C-alpha cells in the first residue's frame, strides 16, 4: 500500500512520481485523500501537472483521476470571461477523443464555448477525431459550419481533418466536395481522397486523382494506396505490377502489397519471384506466402517456408495451422499448436483457437476437446464471439451434445451465431424437435434469425423426419423474415419431402426453384427415388446427373445401387464398366478411433492402420 511519510514534504514532483507508481485505483484514491487533507490539491500548478501527466495515460485509473482533477479544480472554479489558455482543455479533450468514450470530447468542446474559453485548431481537430470514431457525421458538419463562421476555415490542417471525418463516416461525396473547394491542397489532402476511393473500390476515380496529383506531392503513401487498390482485383494486378516497377522508391508495405495481390489471385510463382528478391521481409511477408501456398493445396511448400522463418509470431503459426486445416491435415495442425506452446512460448490468441477447435472437431477427439476447453477457461478467453461458436461446434462434432449445450447456456450475451451453432449441433445429433424449439425461442426473444439459422433448423427437421415443422420453418423464413431461400434451403426441403415419400412434391419443388438445382439436390432426390422404388424417375435423374457431373463417383454408385435394388444386375455391371472405362473410382471411406490417447486411422479395403498422438 502506498502512503506518504508524515515528515515528507508533499512537493509537486514527488506527488507526480508517487502517482505514476500507482498500481490500482485504490492507490490513487488514497493519494487523492491525502492531497485533500493537506490542502495541496488546491495548488493550480499541481493540478495542471496531474492533468498533463496522466490525462492520456494507458492506465484507466490514472486517466480517470486526471480528468476528475481537471473538472473539479479547473472547470468548476473557472469564471466566465476569464482568459484561459486552451492547452489544458485540449489535453483532456485528447484523452477523451482517443479513449473509451469519445462523446465526452464533444461535451467538453461545448463547455469551452459556453464558458468563453478560447478554442483553437487543435481543440477542433481532436473533436473531429472523436466524431470520426463515433461515426457522428452530423457533429462533424456542425463543426464544419463553426469553422466557416470563425476565421479557422482556411486552415489546411482542419480542412484535411474534415476530409478524413467524412471519409471515415462513409460520406465520399461530402469529402470530395470539401477537397474540390479547398484553395490549397497538400499531399495529405490527395492521399486521404485516394485512399477513400480505394477503400470504396473506386479504383478508376483514385487513379484519376493520382494522375492529377503534382509529382512533388506523390510519396510512398500515394503509391502504396494505388498498388493496394489495383492488387485487389484480378484485372488490376498487372497494372499494380507496372506501378510497382515505376515507383521511385519502395518500402516494405509496397513489397507486401504486391505479394498479397499475387497471392490473392493464385499467382504464387509471381509472388515467390518478388519474395526471393525483396531486400527485407517481415512476419507479414512470410505469413502471406504460407497462406498463398496453403490455399493452392501446396501444404508442403508452405511448411518449408514456415520452417525457414527466422522469427515466428502468433500470426505465422496461425497461417500454418489454418493452411493445414484448409487442406484437411488436422493432426498436423494440432502438432503445430503443440510446438507453438512448447517451443516458442508464444501465447495463442482467439484466432489460434478458432483455427484449432475445428481441427479437433474433424478428428472427433472428445478427450482433446475437453482438454482444450479447460485450457480456454484457465486462460480466461472470452466466449461471446467466434470462439464460443467454435467451441459449441467442436463439442457437437465430437459427439457430446451435452457439453455443447453447457457451453451454450454459459454464454451470457449470445449472438445469433451461437444459436446457429447450437441448432447445427442438434441437427447433427438428430434432435430435430429441440432444434425447432430453439427457433421458437429465438422468435420469443425477438432475435433476428438469418439464413444460416433456417438451414440448421431445416436440416434438423430433415434428419428427424419432421415434415410439418420443416414446411412451417420454410414458410416462416420466406413470409415473416423475408429471407429468400438459397440452394441449401431448397436442398433441405427436397430432402424433407423425399424422405417422407412425397416424391411428386419434391419433384415439383425442384422444377419450381428459381435457381438451378445442383448435383447435391439431384443426388438427394435420386436416393429417395431408389428408396421408395420410383424407378423410372430415378433412372432419368441418374442419367441427368451423369451428364451434369460426369466425373463424380457418387452419381454412378447411386445409379448402380438403384439397379441392384431392383435385381437388374446386367445394368449394375454396365454402370461399373462405365466407371472403369472413364477411370472413375470411389473415394475410400476413412474412420478414426481414439484408444489409449492415440488416434488410429482406418481406410476401406486397407489392412494397414496409421496412428498418431
Swiss-Prot record:
Q: Where are the PPR repeats?
A: 85-119, 120-154, 155-185, 186-216, 219-250, 251-285, 286-312, 313-347, 349-383, 384-414, 415-449, 450-480, 486-516
- Which GO cellular component does the record give, naming just one? chloroplast
PROSITE patterns with a match to the protein in the record: PPR
Residue ranges of region Type E motif? 521-596
Taxonomy, superkingdom: Eukaryota
* Chloroplast recorded as keyword: yes
Name its GO BP terms in alphabetical order.
chloroplast RNA modification; mRNA modification; mRNA processing
Which keywords, in A-to-Z order, does the entry hold? Chloroplast, mRNA processing, Plastid, Repeat, RNA-binding, Transit peptide
Function of the protein: Plays a major role in chloroplast RNA editing. Acts as a site-recognition transacting factor to recruit C-deaminase. Involved in single RNA editing events. Required for the edition of the site 1 of ndhD (ndhD-1 site corresponding to cytidine-2), which is a plastid-encoded subunit of the NADH-plastoquinone oxidoreductase. The interaction with DYW1 is required for its function in editing the ndhD-1 site.
Read off the PANTHER family from this record: PENTATRICOPEPTIDE REPEAT-CONTAINING PROTEIN, PENTATRICOPEPTIDE REPEAT-CONTAINING PROTEIN ELI1, CHLOROPLASTIC
What does the sequence similarity comment in the record state about its family?
Belongs to the PPR family. PCMP-E subfamily.
What does the subunit section of this Swiss-Prot or TrEMBL entry state? Interacts with DYW1.
Q: Which NCBIfam families match?
A: PPR
Q: What is this protein called?
A: Pentatricopeptide repeat-containing protein At2g45350, chloroplastic
Native source organism of the sequence? Arabidopsis thaliana
Lineage start:
Eukaryota, Viridiplantae, Streptophyta, Embryophyta, Tracheophyta
Amino acid at each position: 500500500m502506498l502512503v506518504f511519510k508524515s515528515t515528507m514534504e508533499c512537493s509537486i514532483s514527488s506527488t507526480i512520481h508517487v502517482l505514476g507508481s500507482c498500481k490500482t485505483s485504490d492507490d490513487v484514491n488514497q493519494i487523492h485523500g491525502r492531497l485533500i487533507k493537506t490542502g495541496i490539491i488546491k495548488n493550480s500548478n499541481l493540478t495542471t501537472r496531474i492533468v498533463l501527466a496522466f490525462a492520456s495515460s494507458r492506465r484507466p485509473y490514472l486517466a480517470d483521476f486526471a480528468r476528475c482533477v481537471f473538472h473539479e479544480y479547473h472547470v468548476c472554479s473557472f469564471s466566465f470571461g476569464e482568459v484561459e489558455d486552451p492547452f489544458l482543455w485540449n489535453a483532456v479533450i485528447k484523452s477523451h477523443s482517443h479513449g473509451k468514450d469519445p462523446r465526452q470530447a464533444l461535451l467538453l468542446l461545448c463547455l469551452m464555448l459556453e464558458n468563453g474559453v478560447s478554442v483553437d485548431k487543435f481543440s477542433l481537430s481532436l473533436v473531429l477525431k472523436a466524431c470520426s470514431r463515433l461515426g457522428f457525421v452530423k457533429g462533424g458538419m456542425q463543426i464544419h459550419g463553426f469553422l466557416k463562421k470563425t476565421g479557422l476555415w482556411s486552415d489546411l490542417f482542419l480542412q484535411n481533418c474534415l476530409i478524413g471525418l467524412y471519409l471515415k463516416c462513409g460520406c465520399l461525396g461530402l469529402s470530395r466536395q470539401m477537397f474540390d473547394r479547398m484553395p490549397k491542397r497538400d499531399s495529405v489532402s490527395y492521399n486521404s481522397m485516394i485512399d477513400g476511393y480505394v477503400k470504396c473500390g473506386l479504383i478508376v476515380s483514385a487513379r484519376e486523382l493520382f494522375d492529377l496529383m503534382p509529382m512533388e506531392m506523390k510519396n510512398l503513401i500515394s503509391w502504396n494506396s494505388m498498388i493496394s487498390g489495383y492488387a485487389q482485383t484480378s484485372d488490376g494486378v498487372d497494372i499494380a505490377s507496372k506501378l510497382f516497377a515505376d515507383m521511385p522508391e519502395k518500402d516494405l508495405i509496397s513489397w507486401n502489397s504486391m505479394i498479397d495481390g499475387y497471392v490473392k489471385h493464385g499467382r504464387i510463382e509471381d509472388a515467390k519471384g518478388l519474395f526471393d528478391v525483396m531486400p527485407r521481409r517481415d512476419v507479414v511477408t512470410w505469413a502471406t506466402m504460407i497462406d498463398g501456398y496453403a490455399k493452392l493445396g501446396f501444404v508442403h511448400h508452405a511448411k518449408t517456408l514456415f520452417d525457414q522463418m527466422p522469427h515466428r509470431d502468433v500470426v505465422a503459426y496461425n497461417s500454418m495451422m489454418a493452411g493445414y486445416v484448409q487442406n484437411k491435415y488436422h493432426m498436423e495442425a494440432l502438432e503445430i499448436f503443440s510446438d507453438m506452446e512448447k517451443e516458442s512460448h508464444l501465447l495463442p490468441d482467439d484466432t489460434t483457437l478458432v483455427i484449432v477447435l475445428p481441427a479437433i472437431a474433424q478428428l472427433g477427439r472428445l478427450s482433446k476437446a475437453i482438454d482444450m476447453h479447460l485450457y480456454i477457461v484457465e486462460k480466461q478467453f472470452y466466449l461471446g464471439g467466434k470462439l464460443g461458436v467454435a467451441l459449441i461446434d467442436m463439442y457437437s462434432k465430437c459427439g457430446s451434445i451435452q457439453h455443447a449445450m453447457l457451453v451454450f447456456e454459459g454464454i451470457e450475451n449470445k449472438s445469433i451465431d451461437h444459436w446457429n451453432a447450437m441448432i447445427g449441433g442438434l441437427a447433427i445429433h438428430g434432435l430435430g424437435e429441440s432444434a425447432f424449439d430453439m427457433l421458437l425461442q429465438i422468435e420469443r426473444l425477438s432475435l433476428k434469425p438469418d439464413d444460416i439459422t433456417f438451414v440448421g433448423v431445416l436440416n434438423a427437421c430433415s434428419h428427424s423426419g419432421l415434415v410439418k415443422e420443416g414446411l412451417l420453418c420454410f414458410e416462416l423464413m420466406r413470409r415473416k423474415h423475408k429471407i429468400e431461400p438459397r440452394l441449401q434451403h431448397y436442398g433441405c426441403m427436397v430432402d424433407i419431402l423425399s424422405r417422407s415419400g412425397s416424391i411428386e412434391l419434391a419433384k415439383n419443388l425442384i422444377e419450381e426453384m428459381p435457381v438451378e438445382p445442383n448435383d447435391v439436390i439431384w443426388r438427394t432426390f435420386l436416393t429417395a427415388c431408389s428408396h421408395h422404388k420410383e424407378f423410372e424417375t430415378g433412372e432419368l435423374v441418374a442419367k441427368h446427373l451423369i451428364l451434369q457431373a460426369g466425373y463424380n463417383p457418387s452419381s454412378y454408385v447411386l445409379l448402380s445401387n438403384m439397379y441392384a435394388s431392383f435385381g437388374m444386375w446386367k445394368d449394375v455391371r454396365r454402370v461399373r464398366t462405365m466407371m472403369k472405362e472413364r477411370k472413375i473410382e470411389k473415394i475410400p471411406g476413412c474412420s478414426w478411433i481414439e484408444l489409449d490417447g492415440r488416434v488410429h486411422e482406418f481406410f476401406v479395403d486397407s489392412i494397414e492402420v496409421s496412428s498418431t498422438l
